[in-house]
Amino acid sequence: MEKAEKGNPKGKAFRGNKLAFGEYGIQALDRAWITQQQIEAVRVALVRS
């Protein structure tokens, strides 16, 4: 069995781009995968400010 390919994150999201709660969100400036550690770092920075 071969390892599944991760693929390429393409274009802009048309679903799931509304804030569910809170006042702040992050927006990507380029196409790339984002890790859980990066998301957590942003969350901590927002909580501290």
From Swiss-Prot:
GO biological process per UniProt: translation
GO molecular function, one term: rRNA binding
SUPFAM superfamilies tied to this protein: Ribosomal protein L16p/L10e
One Pfam family, short name: Ribosomal_L16
Listed GO CC annotations: ribonucleoprotein complex; ribosome
Keywords: Ribonucleoprotein, Ribosomal protein, RNA-binding, rRNA-binding, tRNA-binding
Family as reported in the entry's similarity comment: Belongs to the universal ribosomal protein uL16 family.
Subunit composition and interactions: Part of the 50S ribosomal subunit.
Function, in words: Binds 23S rRNA and is also seen to make contacts with the A and possibly P site tRNAs.
Protein name, as recorded: Large ribosomal subunit protein uL16
Organism encoding this protein: Aquifex pyrophilus
